[in-house]
Amino acid sequence: MKSAISKFGCAAFVIGAVALGVSTDANAQRKFTFGYDQPRSTAYGIAADIFDAKLKEVSGGKLSIDQFPGAQLGQEPVMLQKLRTGDIDFVITSTANASTVAPQAGVFSLHFIFRDQDHLAKTLADPQVSQAFREMIKESVQGAQVLGLITMGMRNMYAKKDIKSVEDVKGQKVRVQATKTEDTHFPAYGAQTVHMPFGEVYTSLQTGVVNVAENGVNVYLANKHYEVAPVLSMTEHEANNNCIWVSDKTWNSFSDEEKKWVQAAAEEVSRTEPMKALALEKESAERLKKLGVKVVEGVDKAGFIKAAQPIQDQLAKELGPHAEKILGLVRNIK
């Protein structure tokens, strides 16, 4: 009787384990939480899809992710905190938000350091740039590390009126990411900076708390900011760069082989996501035009650049040696 009960108990455990998706052998699948604060239809979703597909490929299906888009796990600063405590496995954040825990990450928020979109894509795929950024994060942040770099394209300004030159932002209240670089660049253009979580931007534009916001074209489209700020001016003042993070708790749970799989997936994202994200930006601009949004092209950038360029080296030096090194690497990429 005792033997029969034991056998029944073992069988029940196995059935329960299968029903719950619990591993009963070393080759079972493992799924990890992957959070980001933008809709699935943005470049964040593109990056997560590439990461998941490559991870499944190299691991033979043993490792994969569950995506939590649209700030389901919190806005980026909140997710970063949860990541560092091991409550989330993977997160995508902007490099600007990364600078809240690693100030030298603000180097990627410097204005007009990328000559064009091709230069941007080459930079993010460059192993030296990626390694320099990862070393900087490793030295500055406890509880998490960066696996790779991605982009959402270039940031542009949007408002209820045209921004055709630097004169048009003078005296305006501009919602910016809370970084030293933004708080230095925009006042140099004559604007007043305002900090707030991304989720508050729509209402703040609607009520006039801010007059201007800035972000990628697809982000502007996906979050329907055009409803309250129907003029998109293509200032392309800053790259909308981002990074893929992993919790140290999760990373340390991987075998050496699994770490290689995860890093390979991140490298695939850095190599292929930028061009897809840039293509998405162009598609989004066309969709916005059809929705009646006024897209101001041919912005006179000369005044912006004249104010921004002297600040680049000054800010990089103030941020620290890692920032100076990364800026030098960016400038040297042909």
Show where each model-derived region lies.
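Sec/Tat signal peptide C-region and signal peptidase I cleavage site
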Residues: 20-28
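Residue-level signal for alpha-helical transmembrane segments in multi-pass membrane proteins
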Residues: 13-20
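Bacterial N-terminal signal peptides that target proteins for export
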Residues: 1-12
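N-terminal secretory/targeting leader peptides
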Residues: 29-120, 128, 135-334
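Coiled-coil-like amphipathic alpha-helices with heptad-repeat character
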Residues: 2, 25-26, 98
